[in-house]
């Protein structure tokens, strides 16, 4: 059964470190290889019978290098807009996402001030211009994964003259997003190519 296998995996992967884990409230996991496909939070502590997520707050990091860099970052004091969202971009190559539009509209009501761009206004150019000023950046658009070249994986926005609307990993890495909380409400944003020493190169990795 699922629970039996979840307990076996817990014992194989985490039991040896149980003494250290028991002292911590937060657990940061840096998976390797096929372990990126494993939701550690669903493992079951064979002693307590509880899911790991019930006992600890679980976080993931793509590599130790990225984790170290994140820990050394300082918090900036810039004036940032509370909430910036993009949803339901208009494209011929993907289906519309009307529920994503409602999603960001409802969340935007909880923030003041907020700026929400949908359909034809949800452009790549506007993301690049507005995102550096956002405290919370919420992107509810289609994602496109390139397994051959992970730097060409992209979030899909509304195209306009001289702009294909594909915000690639390479482009995201060049953006300045000081201390922003980024929410990727898209399919496959945590999928990508696992490289030795670098970890998982994905759309979510690009925002770290």
Enumerate the predicted regions with their spans.
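Catalytic cores of enzymes
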Residues: 1-208
């Amino acid at each position: 059964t699922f629970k039996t296998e979840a307990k076996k995996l817990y014992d194989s992967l985490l039991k040896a470190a149980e003494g250290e884990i028991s002292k911590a409230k937060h657990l940061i996991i840096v998976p390797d290889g096929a372990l990126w496909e494993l939701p550690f939070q669903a493992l079951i502590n064979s002693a307590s019978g509880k899911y790991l997520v019930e006992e600890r707050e679980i976080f993931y990091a793509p590599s130790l290098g990225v984790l170290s860099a994140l820990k050394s970052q300082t918090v900036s004091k810039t004036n940032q807009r509370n909430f910036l969202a993009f949803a339901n971009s208009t494209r011929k190559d993907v289906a519309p996402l009307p529920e994503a539009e409602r999603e960001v509209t409802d969340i935007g009501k909880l923030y003041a001030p907020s700026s929400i761009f949908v359909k034809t206004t949800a452009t790549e150019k506007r993301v690049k211009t507005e995102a550096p000023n956002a405290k919370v950046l919420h992107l509810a658009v289609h994602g496109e994964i390139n397994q051959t070249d992970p730097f060409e994986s992209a979030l899909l926005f509304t195209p306009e003259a001289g702009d294909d609307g594909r915000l690639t990993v390479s482009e995201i890495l060049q953006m300045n997003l000081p201390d922003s909380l980024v929410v990727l409400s898209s399919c496959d944003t945590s999928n990508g190519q696992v490289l030795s020493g670098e970890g998982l190169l994905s759309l979510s990795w690009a925002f770290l």
